Amino acid sequence: RLFAAGPLPTPIEFRGVRIGVPICEDIWLPEVCAHLKATGAEILVSPNGSPYEIDKDDLRVGGVAAKRVAETGLPLAYLNRVGGQDELVFDGASFVLNADGTLAHQLPDWDACVVATQWERRQGGWACLPGARAALDPHPADIYHAMVVGLRDYVNANRFPGVVLGLSGGIDSALSAAVAVDALGAERVRCVMLPSRYTADISLNDAT
């Protein structure tokens, strides 16, 4: 009701290079990248706010990005946001694919960073020289890291001084405490045991 589809984007020129800028979901379907190629793009640079999901890295690199590169014959730099916003968490893991489908750069997940890439013009077009190849979090470490980043950024964005957790002695509250300490530091986490007459002694011991 509020927005209508605009025209397909055209490349921008930067230092003599025509760069296509498909934004986020523009690369999930072929039309935008194909149009950028047809209108003279030499390199694709795709800024993204792509939230974390299990196995999302494989889908981005080997699925969506690889398809657009194969279809257009253009290298693609995929730039993803890092951090949490409310219920969403963004894992970063930016990368560069060359026109032949090879991975030239893989940036780390969960860590905002700036990396200078080197490019050279070859007979078939531009190519990114090989560079950083960070190892991404394995599963299930990626899930834990997502919880830590999401909690950290939510608490800090809302300027909360810290968190208070009720401990039961069970594994669920123990995990919650571990996530909170890794996200905020022990000095910003206060754990409280709230026993009742039904609480077993072993639960009290585990909680303390």
Regions found by a protein language model. Name each.
Residues 1-166, 177-188, 193, 198:
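Enzyme catalytic cores with a strong preference for nitrogen-chemistry domains
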Residues 196-208:
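ATP-dependent adenylate-handling ligase core
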Residues 173-176, 200-202:
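Short glycine/serine/threonine-rich phosphate/pyrophosphate-binding segments
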